[in-house]
């Protein structure tokens, strides 16, 4: 069974699945779209490094093995149709909704849930919505929230070793065959905001037409390789 999304192809084979990263990059609920040769392999390896780091922190992810150049062997999950966002600083849609300055600290990590629905522009929902709509139980939502904060603080610590700031990050979770909440999808410049002394190292370069996003994505991969080898 195969499934193709905007940036990945999923192939389920027996007890495992293969997650193949495409070279596509999108923004604005898919309205902006380009193909950047090499992006898929960069995001796949970045994800593999960061998920391996998380597993060393006793955090469950779907990663089994990185198959160069652009494929991850993963545990199949029954995915929640959600994006779980953790914000450490004000940025993006948070500033548009609530005001404030980009890069302003939040007093505590803020967790937000969004239903994956491009036509409705990924509506933000609360835990009660998730239960009423049959998307997740309150217990599952709390597990996702708890895991998302733990993962974010671990990644914040990882990047701080090189004086990079993690501003916010988006996750997708699913259930394994035993009903455990497990981190799926990817961790890459497609899914987080990463800054260094005001310089942007994430998809905002593409969203805002600030230059070559592939160059920044490569620099993030090199950073992850370097930090991983320390």
Swiss-Prot record:
Gene3D superfamilies cross-referenced by the UniProt entry: ATP-grasp fold, B domain, Phosphorylase Kinase, domain 1
Molecular function GO labels: ATP binding; phosphoribosylaminoimidazolesuccinocarboxamide synthase activity
UniProt pathway: Purine metabolism; IMP biosynthesis via de novo pathway; 5-amino-1-(5-phospho-D-ribosyl)imidazole-4-carboxamide from 5-amino-1-(5-phospho-D-ribosyl)imidazole-4-carboxylate: step 1/2
SUPFAM superfamilies on file: SAICAR synthase-like (SSF56104)
Enzyme class: ligase
InterPro entries reported for this sequence: SAICAR_synt/ADE2_N, SAICAR_synt_PurC, SAICAR_synthetase, SAICAR_synthetase_CS
Gene symbol of the encoding locus: purC
The name this protein goes by in its record: Phosphoribosylaminoimidazole-succinocarboxamide synthase
Keywords: ATP-binding, Ligase, Nucleotide-binding, Purine biosynthesis
Organism, scientific name: Thermotoga sp. (strain RQ2)
Reaction(s) catalysed by this chain's protein: 5-amino-1-(5-phospho-D-ribosyl)imidazole-4-carboxylate + L-aspartate + ATP = (2S)-2-[5-amino-1-(5-phospho-beta-D-ribosyl)imidazole-4-carboxamido]succinate + ADP + phosphate + 2 H(+)
Any matching Pfam family: SAICAR_synt
């Amino acid at each position: 069974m195969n499934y193709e999304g905007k940036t990945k192809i999923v192939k389920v084979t027996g007890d495992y699945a293969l997650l193949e990263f495409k070279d596509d990059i999108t923004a604005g609920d898919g309205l902006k779209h380009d193909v950047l040769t090499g992006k898929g392999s960069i995001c796949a390896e970045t994800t593999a490094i960061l998920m391996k780091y998380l597993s060393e922190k006793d955090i469950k992810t779907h990663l089994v093995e990185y198959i160069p150049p652009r494929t991850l062997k993963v545990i199949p999950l029954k995915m929640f149709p959600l994006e779980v966002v953790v914000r450490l600083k004000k940025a993006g849609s948070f500033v548009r909704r609530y005001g404030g300055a980009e890069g302003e600290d939040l007093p505590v990590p803020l967790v937000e849930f969004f239903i994956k629905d491009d036509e409705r522009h990924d509506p933000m929902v609360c835990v009660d919505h998730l239960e009423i709509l049959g998307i997740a139980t309150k217990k599952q939502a709390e597990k996702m929230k708890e895991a998302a904060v733990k993962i974010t603080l671990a990644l914040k610590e990882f990047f701080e070793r090189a004086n990079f700031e993690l501003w916010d990050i988006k996750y997708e979770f699913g259930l394994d065959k035993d009903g455990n909440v497990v981190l799926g999808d990817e961790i890459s410049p497609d899914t987080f905001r990463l800054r260094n002394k005001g310089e942007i190292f994430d998809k905002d370069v593409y969203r805002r037409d600030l230059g070559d996003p592939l160059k920044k994505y490569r620099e993030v991969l090199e950073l992850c390789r370097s930090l991983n080898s320390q």
